[in-house]
Amino acid sequence: MKILLIGMGGTIASVKGENGYEASLSVKEVLDIAGIKDCEDCDFLDLKNVDSTLIQPEDWVDLAETLYKNVKKYDGIIVTHGTDTLAYTSSMISFMLRNPPIPIVFTGSMIPATEENSDAPLNLQTAIKFATSGIRGVYVAFNGKVMLGVRTSKVRTMSRDAFESINYPIIAELRGEDLVVNFIPKFNNGEVTLDLRHDPKVLVIKLIPGLSGDIFRAAVELGYRGIVIEGYGAGGIPYRGSDLLQTIEELSKEIPIVMTTQAMYDGVDLTRYKVGRLALRAGVIPAGDMTKEATVTKLMWILGHTNNVEEIKVLMRKNLVGELRD
């Protein structure tokens, strides 16, 4: 089967220099150094070579366009990418590139491929096995697991087991030499489409005790077109000793204000507590069980299509690519 590997940089492609590790290896060099032998019918393309902290929305556009041009030429595509923003990229690609007819698999490593104890060989082998599975969609392969790209979050900063599938089944797992498929997502059978429209003017604000409405007003004045609040637990807005709820009620008529949770699992339910119900009445849009990465990139993508707050509310609460429980 014919596979394309696209290099974006990251730890997997990094070499240690005077200023620490820096992405510099080509994706072909990464494969060779990792000792991957089962990729004889592979092509290689170096699109970027950067630390993923440097990834910007324009890089998503470049990658989505490149993927779109190649999805009908290959049986699978692997994207090597830095881990810090990998889940943002896999989520945005899921929204920009609909109904890919092949597996598109993101992977990387926590330890550079040049190091003896690198996890690059395991992750690349897992990605190659899944890229030849014929299971279409956008995925992340890491530490012997395959996860849906729009349901993946980085949860550890040092461990090889850096990513988890959030509120969604693990798609496949490596057991010995075999990749065992546990779950196949259901997607529409439509033709692959590319829709790059998005607006990156989204601000994420973490709710903490004492937070006031000033920062929300400032965000609107600075031209931000959407706000995501990382709230507590199941979600809610404080109404005691703060102008926050009143401010949000005023601003939610102008821009979408979405609430996700600081907790990793289970998502938000704004109907559960009074603080949540008051937030709903104030116009806050619940993110449901979406990851923070999916919430942010979905809002960016929707803002590229409409400014109408009511339309945005409907789309944010609609499952588009598997990011949200129906």
UniProtKB/Swiss-Prot annotation:
This is L-asparaginase. Catalyzes the hydrolysis of L-asparagine into L-aspartate and ammonia. Displays no glutaminase activity, a highly desirable therapeutic property. Microbial L-asparaginase is considered as an important biopharmaceutical drug enzyme in the treatment of childhood acute lymphoblastic leukemia (ALL). It functions by reducing the availability of circulatory L-asparagine to tumor cells. The principle behind the cytotoxic effect of L-asparaginase stems from the fact that the leukemic lymphoblastic tumor cells and other blood tumor cells are auxotrophs towards the L-asparagine and exhibit low L-asparagine synthetase (ASNS) activity for de novo synthesis of L-asparagine. Consists of distinct N- and C-terminal domains (NPfA and CPfA, respectively), connected by a linker. NPfA acts as a specific internal chaperone by mediating folding of its own C-domain (CPfA), but also functions as a non-specific molecular chaperone by preventing aggregation of unrelated proteins. The linker is dispensable since domains of this enzyme can assemble without the linker into a conjoined tetrameric form that exhibits higher activity than the parent enzyme, while each domain is inactive independently. The keyword Zinc does not apply. L-aspartate binds at residues 11, 51-52, 83-84. Optimum pH is 9.0. GO terms for molecular function: asparaginase activity. Absence of glutaminase activity, higher stability, and mesoactivity makes P.furiosus L-asparaginase and its mutants promising candidates for clinical as well as industrial usage. Keywords: Hydrolase. NCBIfam families: asnASE_I. Gene3D superfamilies: 3.40.50.40, L-asparaginase, N-terminal domain. It comes from the Archaea. InterPro entries: AsnA_fam, Asp/glu_Ase-like_sf, Asparaginase/glutaminase-like, Asparaginase/glutaminase_AS2, Asparaginase_C, L-asparaginase_C, L-asparaginase_I, L-asparaginase_N. It comes from Pyrococcus furiosus (strain ATCC 43587 / DSM 3638 / JCM 8422 / Vc1). GO terms for biological process: amino acid metabolic process. Homodimer. Heating induces higher order association. Forms homotetramers at 80 degrees Celsius. Its EC number is 3.5.1.1. Residues 179-182 are annotated as: Important for activity at high temperatures. Belongs to the asparaginase 1 family. It catalyses: L-asparagine + H2O = L-aspartate + NH4(+). The active site is at residues 11, 83-84, 154, 273. Optimum temperature is around 90 degrees Celsius. Thermostable. The extreme thermal stability of this enzyme is due to the presence of high intersubunit associative forces supported by extensive H-bonding and ionic interactions network. SMART domains: Asparaginase (SM00870). Residues 1-319 form the Asparaginase/glutaminase domain.
